[in-house]
Each structure stands twice: as C-alpha cells, then as structure tokens.
C-alpha cells in the first residue's frame, strides 16, 4: 500500500521525522518497503495565468503566449502543449529556475521568437513519469505563489506491506490509528457533515442472500455534472497513492476508499430496469454484459448486484460493465455494503478479478462505517459536481453482521508467554489506545475488540498486540534460565549455520521462500506425489504445501533471469511437507537443505576467453564440499537414478552407506522448456536430519616417509561408473599403504571402441613405518589390475 505522509499527518501528526515514522511502522509489523519524496527539490517555478495565446507564425501546433506571473511584466513563452490556451492558470518556470533533473531555465529563441521560461508539465517537475499537456491549476490558484509550496510537494510517499489479517490498515485512517496508538496520541474524529435529502427518490433493495450481504445502504444522487474537474487536492492525494484520475465520481469514490477503507459501488440510475436493486445468486447460464460489449458467463451461485432483469455487477468487485457511469451520466446510485470476506475472496479468485474492491472486501471492511462512507462520498460529490441527494435506503440484518466477542486475558498467561512483566496500567492503556473496550479486576482483563479488528478472536491475539505496541525493542534482554546440564560428549551435531556459511563462502546466496508453492510447478517436478492442498490459499500461485525446496528455488531463478541475471548460485533450508498416512497428522515434516546453480561457471572477465556454462560436476563439487564437513565423505556414494524432475543422464541419488539422503542433477530439458528457463539449471537437495551428525575425526600420525603414485588405465563399458572402479581398488590394500585413489582422466574417441571409455586412476602410496619398496607397490598395482579386468570385463591400455 502507498500513501502520502502529509495525508497521514492530517489525521495524526506525531513530533517525529519521516525516517522515525517509517521505523515505527516497521517495528509495529508494517514493513516499509520504500520512503521517497514526491519529487526532487526545484525552485523558480510559480503560478501564472496565460493572458494571451497565439499560433507561432513559423511552426505548426506551437503557441506564443503571454503569461502573468505576478510581476509587472508579462512573460513571453513559447509552448507546444495541446492544452495550451488563454485564461488558464499554469506552473511557470522562469529564467533562472532549476528543475528536478538539474536543468536551469535560460532565455531561448525558437524560430525567431524569444521564450522567457517554460510552461511546466507534471513530468518536467518530476512528479509523474509521463503526462500529456501542461499543468492546469484551479482558476482561484494565487498568481505568483511558489508552485512547490502551493502543491505541498514537501511530502513523502511511504509504501508498506500490509499482512492479510490487517484489512483494517488498508486505509489512511487505519494506518493513522496505529501511529496514534504507538505515539500515545489521540486520533482526530471523523467529521462528516450530515446529508439532508433534497429529493424523495428512493430505490427498493432486495437482499436474497442475507448471510453473505447482511448490510446494504443505497442513495440516489441526481443532476450531477460528471464532466466537472476533480479538485486538485483530491487528484494529488490519489496520484501520490498510485491511483490515476478518471473522472470526478470515480476519483471521489477512490479517495474515500483510501481514506476510510470502505468501497462504494456506483451505477448509472438510468440504466437500471424496474427501479429495484437485488443482491442474489446468479442464475444458470446468466450473462453479464461488460463495458466493451463482451459478455462474461457467470458461474452458478455467484453473488451479484442486479436489477429486476439483469446482473449489474459481481458483488465486491469493480466489474467494468455496460451499466457503469459514463460521460453522459447525470443520475447515479451510490451503494455501500458489507459482504462476507471469504465469499468475495473465493469469487475474485474464480473470476481472476483482483482489484481494489475485492482486495478490501476479501480482508474485511468495517460494517460500522458503511453509512459514514456513503455520506462522505455524497458530501464530496455535492461539493465538487453538484447534485441533489435522496434519502438513504437501509437494509441491515444485525443478526447476520459479524459481532466482536468478549475475550478474557489472564495476567499469568501474558507474563508466561512474553517472558517479562508490563504494568497493569500500561497494558490497559495500550488496549484502550488500540480502541478496545477494557475492564480489569483480579488480574484479569475483560476485553471487547473494536468493529474494525476482525483478526482479534483469542487471548493470544491480544498478547501479540500488547507486545507489538509496547515495542519489540523494549523487551528486556534476559538470559534463558535452565536446569539442563550440557553433556560435552555430544559434540557431534553440526549447526545448520556451519553448512550455510560454507555455501556462502562458495559463492551461494541464501533465499527464503514461502512453504506454499505453485501447484503446476510442483506437479512438473514431482508428478507421482500428491501434495497437501490448501483450502483457502493466499493466491492461486501458492495453493499447495511444498514437497521439496526446488519449487521455490526454480521460481527465484526464473524471476532473476527475467532481470538479466546470468549467473545464479542460491540455496535454501526449510521444512518440506510429505503426506504419509502413518505419520503424525498424516504428514512428515522434513528439514531439507537444497541448492541451485544456473548460467555461467564464472563471472565475465577479460582474461576468460571461453564462456563455460555450469555443469553437473560443478554442483557435485559443492555437494561434496558440504558433505565433507560431516567427515563421512568416504561413505557417500552417488548412484545413477532416474528422477522425474532431472535429466536421466545427468542425475544421481546420494547415499550415505545404504540410506538415500538426497538427489542431485540437471533439470530435465522438457521441464526447462516448459518453465522458460533460458540456460541449464542444476539442483541438489539433502535431508538435514540425515547429514547433521558428523564423525569426530581421528588423530593420525603424519608419515615422514616419501609418497609415491602409479597410474592404471583401463578400458571399460560406458555403463561402469568411476566410483565403482575406485571402490574395488580400495578393497585390495589397507590404508597403511594405499592412502588415496583419484580419477585423473576419462577418454573416449580414437582407438577406443564404441560403447567403451578409458579410465585412468591414480593410486597414492605411503607407509607410516618405512619407505615402500618397488615390489610392494607393484604387487598392489598388479592386484588392482587383475581384479578390475575380472570385475568390469576391462582391458588395460
């Protein structure tokens, strides 16, 4: 959500800086993503009036104007804006003025005509990125006044994250309430002038789904001037909140939505048949005619707003339809309703209509301000574009409206959960500042939440609120007291941070993704597994619980490759949810650690003439380095394995002795193509519980005798893995003589038959007691050669 800091300060103005305000919001649970000025500083721009406007004699669609800027002399200014005309108030950058982009205005001659400044657009002043035409100000804008001060541009735009449970904060007044509570201040009361009906026109309301729409207010407003310009102060506040101006009616409705957090539906009164509004279920095969004359086939049991013949809109959404207002509208119907949040959330997902209205309704709006919001819109419309209001039509079923319930808060439970003591008076004060009705006696608070706090239903919610407003940074640092005695012999558990640090040292970056993942991506990676499906997902992109960490890693790679990132090394640790009937709650929750690599092996460098993409052996090396920390790398085996998500020729299961602990490989080319991955992607995933224990290393004597090595080159069938060859050799001699074996070369091609390959393994010899003789070394080499030829049907080269 974006909002103007100055708009907030109209409601509550704490004596703190903008940065301190942003920090307060973040610490209160509303993370501030961005704090930026409305525009960069500029000077020398004043309000002027065009008193003369003539066509340039030498240029087409260019005007020569005389502008009154409040001085004795009129300015001659050349302008090519399409809306340049006589008798409008404009923003004039005079000679010597400095614009936000650093340009300084100088006297210019354009095709023989001098220009003593420029007439500014919003984009020239850095207020918007793109505009057509010069700024037009109200006719009562004071000539000669500093434009920066007139438009109150010493303002900041604050963008914050609102969690799904805090629908009450999707408005300026909602955020202001929080700031008031944090700073021990009182919020200004909402003052809406009462609307006296001047006409008697009403429209009957029929609510046929009272459980979904228990409250509905309506009003007819006649003879409005919809072509009236939107007041600059409204248009500016909307713009600073990221909403473009449309027309006076839509702008005022959006303004009240941002201000109070309550949507208002508007319909053209002349397009209503039968002089009735019905809130009902859609009928089978029913069609909603959209504004572009296309048709939307309604699904059965969709809640719609209709007249006696046809549906006008899907309830709780902005549906651009044929019955909305247009430039010829004179009479309108204003509607302010309460809809059950879960129903609107479901409908907006079904129809893929995620707009401002559904966003608010799905999170819950305060039913106690429905009439207030309607009066606020009516008042602003009458003031800005005229009109004659009718009486309010009220259809409210109080028994169906959500009601706050009393919650009991116990002193003992509060202290136990938060771990420190807050004074009784401070707790009561915090709750009252948040709008809760509070009674305290015998270490128990009896609390009634306000109507706008749908998220408060249990004692733990209250404890979280008290801690949040008290301030997480005010929680005292107290050492944990425990009677446990640490057994120092249990030093064989590796901290997860050790693994993370190793991966970071190898160039990886840690990411954190949601446990809720995209069903389609997960289905591609694990087609044979059935995940846990969420009944009420946040979005359709987060509808299942993850079976592995690969879904989140791959989605992150896709996001970054679309932003021109050529090399990615990412890892994540987290819980995966594997359905299993005999497990607790029928699901296993396994802690996994996974990584992904994509793109180039190395960053671009002038000394690297050859561009090398990352391959299987790069990520295998990372996994081996990770597993080496466990001191069990000698027990690790990479066995060929066909995983549905991985390339059959470049994948393996990772075994610790005889237990599978994870998988590694390249993403299958088919999946790579379906997900639009532009370069080959390699992944690994390991079970943390399987690798978190390590074997304490043994202290061994360092040999003072020389080391020797010998090579064995053997031709074997392609299906033989080098690891199998090395294992067979290790069985022949003990570690006192044959200390290590490495694969030094793999060759196919000339002089090697088709279907075969040549391995060269290097055997390292060293004794701790004496210098090995040639006979001892040759004896081991010969034994290895014989067993390899016999075991793998090989031929020595």
Swiss-Prot record:
Disulfide bonds: none annotated. InterPro entries: aa-tRNA-synth_II/BPL/LPL, B3/B4_tRNA-bd, DNA-bd_dom_put_sf, Fdx_antiC-bd, Fdx_antiC-bd_sf, NA-bd_OB-fold, Phe-tRNA-ligase_IIc_bsu, Phe-tRNA-ligase_IIc_bsu_bact. SMART domains: B3_4, B5, FDX-ACB. Pfam families: B3_4 (PF03483), B5 (PF03484), FDX-ACB (PF03147), tRNA_bind (PF01588), tRNA_synthFbeta (PF17759). It catalyses: tRNA(Phe) + L-phenylalanine + ATP = L-phenylalanyl-tRNA(Phe) + AMP + diphosphate + H(+). Residues 39-148 form the tRNA-binding domain. Keywords: Aminoacyl-tRNA synthetase, ATP-binding, Cytoplasm, Ligase, Magnesium, Metal-binding, Nucleotide-binding, Protein biosynthesis, RNA-binding, tRNA-binding. Coiled coil: none annotated. GO terms for cellular component: phenylalanine-tRNA ligase complex. The keyword ATP-binding applies. Its cofactor is Mg(2+). Tetramer of two alpha and two beta subunits. This is Phenylalanine--tRNA ligase beta subunit. It comes from Blochmanniella pennsylvanica (strain BPEN).
